[in-house]
């Protein structure tokens, strides 16, 4: 169900890369995977492309929620990646309507200096709270869109899941 959610969402949003391969065969730490084949080399991303990436990343969990009535820890990597994209959109790429066109976070520098006495925030606690709210809102909106896509395409998600089980 999880991987089918990703794949169907990618087919339904406007700005996702085409699905190349879907597998439910466990490999390493992953129970399955959905691979995409970018149509072009990218140096930068449009906001609408990044938002659709969030939707696709969260659609696996949305499919679990819709079909199984519960969610698993299997979406850990999807959530981490989506959260990082959302945070970059807000803090590094100025894609927040509330915070505007400013770079608020030098996240990589903070990681580099972690434990070395450096890496303090370059903004107030109030701004940090706004960042957290903006990232959460973006993630919540993307998850709601993923849920809608899965619910509206329940038959396609089920068919894909059945085919993966039968042919893999």
Which stretches of residues belong to each language-model region?
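Soluble catalytic regions of large protease machineries
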Residues: 1, 7-168
